[in-house]
Amino acid sequence: MAEDDLCSLFFKLKVEDVTSSDELARHMKNASNERKPLIEPGENQSMDIDEEGGSVGHGLLYLYVDCPTMMLCFYGGSLPYNWMQGALLTNLPPYQHDVTLDEVNRGLRQASGFFGYADPMRSAYFAAFSFPGRVIKLNEQMELTSTKGKCLTFDLYASTQLRFELGELVRHGECKFAIG
């Protein structure tokens, strides 16, 4: 299947009729709660512990890239290198109504040092992941300026394990940041 066809299919699978970050958070929380029994160990079940010494639960984390990159990575089951040490994710929700796409792109470019974020379309698509125990919270944060001039701070996370299981992908779609 051609890359355009894959993108077309991917766009059809996005969350529909969600217009605010609160609605998206509720929708994702419900989906995450439905999956919880599948991703958390039950009593007396073994669990893989990452090299850092324990399982870390960060809730949903978001990856921002363009649709063709997303399709190539997901078709292959791996995250893209969007940071010099692997994949950079954040807890910034993709339907944040008081932040523009340009500002998000600026923050991602500054945080990652990735030249690809020079074009806002490089972060116009999101994927929400649930990575129990597979990410490291970085000491730095992404600071953005809202459309009202407020400083907004979001955490940054890194994953050097770029392979992912299909069940770790919770949602994906087109970002709905403010137009500015």
Curated annotation (Swiss-Prot):
Q: Does the keyword Hydrolase apply?
A: yes
Keywords, sorted A to Z: Cytokinin biosynthesis, Glycosidase, Hydrolase
According to its UniProt record, this protein's enzyme class is hydrolase
Q: What is its EC number?
A: 3.2.1.-
- Name the Gene Ontology biological process terms: carbohydrate metabolic process; cytokinin biosynthetic process
Keyword check for Hydrolase: yes
**An annotated Gene Ontology molecular function:** beta-glucosidase activity
Q: What does this protein do?
A: Hydrolyzes cytokinin glucosides thus liberating free cytokinins.
Task: Kindly provide the name given to this protein in its UniProt entry.
Answer: Cytokinin-beta-glucosidase 1
